[in-house]
Amino acid sequence: MLKIKTVTVVGANGTMGTNVSAIFASFGDAKVYMVSRDLEKSKMAAQRAGKTVKADSIVNHLVPADYSMLAECVKESDLVFESAAENLDIKIDLHTRIGQSLKKGAVACTGSSGLSIQRLAECYPEEFRQQFYGVHMFNPPYQLPLCELTASPYSDMELYKELKEYLDQKLHRCVAESKDLPAFLGNRIGFYFINEALIYAERYQDNGGIDYIDSILGPFTGRTMPPITTADFVGLDVHKAIVDNIYENTNDYVHEKFVMPKYVQELIDKGMLGRKAKQGLYKMIKNDSGEKRMMVWDIKDGQFRDEIKYNFPFAIRMKQYLKDGDYDDAVRELINNRSQEADICLRFLLRYIIYSLWTAEHVGYDLRVADDVMATGFTWCPPFAMMEAFTRVCDLGKLMKERLRPEIVNAVDIDHILSLQIKSKYDYRIYFKAK
């Protein structure tokens, strides 16, 4: 296994950089140089990292630094992890600088959520390109152990195997190997679902829009957090960077589903980036008595309003079945209920299964990885587990052909997709929540 005693995290003042620094310092037991543009911000990030893991002892492993110290930090490090903004020009500049000081045998990696690993490897002198990899962790990494590992054509595959072992055994990551394709595997699947939910919110703005769609796709459908709430949590600017990258660099059968709706761009232009900016698609306010109220952006009116607690009959019945432990009847209710809301929900889940398996076949090296990325990176019911939930009560192929639109049925060989089904190691029942 790799012996990583000293790590440099570049962009350590950001949320991900701070959390990754804590992972290297705690699980990795490494000295970590936390580098950002401003030394004071690095110092504050080190304090936040200690609170993140609730272990003051790791603060002694964290060394705040700024870019003027970057070369010296890199020269000393066994591993350099770049966690800067998801902007290709910024990353090219940083990796060019890192490459000037990287020592022979050290690992260099990017935490990019989907930019080209080959392009970033080419920032390094030829003799160091073999030491560069994509190591995409999910945030927050203490709750989401997924790590997507990606090589480039230049990568030393023996070092790759050692890095995989280190991530797995030392940092306790669930390592998913991905091809060097836009957004890798997890975000390709997850942000297809999330962006389509944003599109549907605009389509159904007369019905309520954002909270209407989130209520249709809540925890009772196999996810911890509804999809539009997830976009708000991730950050609308981050969401935009991911879907724009996929749209510009892919051309699969759901290509247009990666076009971000105009209303989301308008929120970004106003600085309303989501939870980190205290407002975005949702906004929490306190009234004079100190009581908290959740507000939601009304797409039609262009202003915030009180969030509506929708009570769709199909959802009420599904939640009751789930509460009683009757998962089969919960799925039957979803299939047999012909309300608009149940139909939207069902078709989302069927499309999720199809696109997950299609993407795993094209982007991953092992179909099982589709389950790993969605379970450990998103805490969503993974596709093979969801297939099991459906196949227990229906002919899934027939259901897909009957309920999905012709553009999906005609674009994908559904029979082939279903032939890929394998037994999931994940239990679908733990993902469907009675709430």
What are these regions (language model features)?
Residues 1-435:
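N-terminal glycine-rich phosphate-binding loop for ADP-containing cofactors
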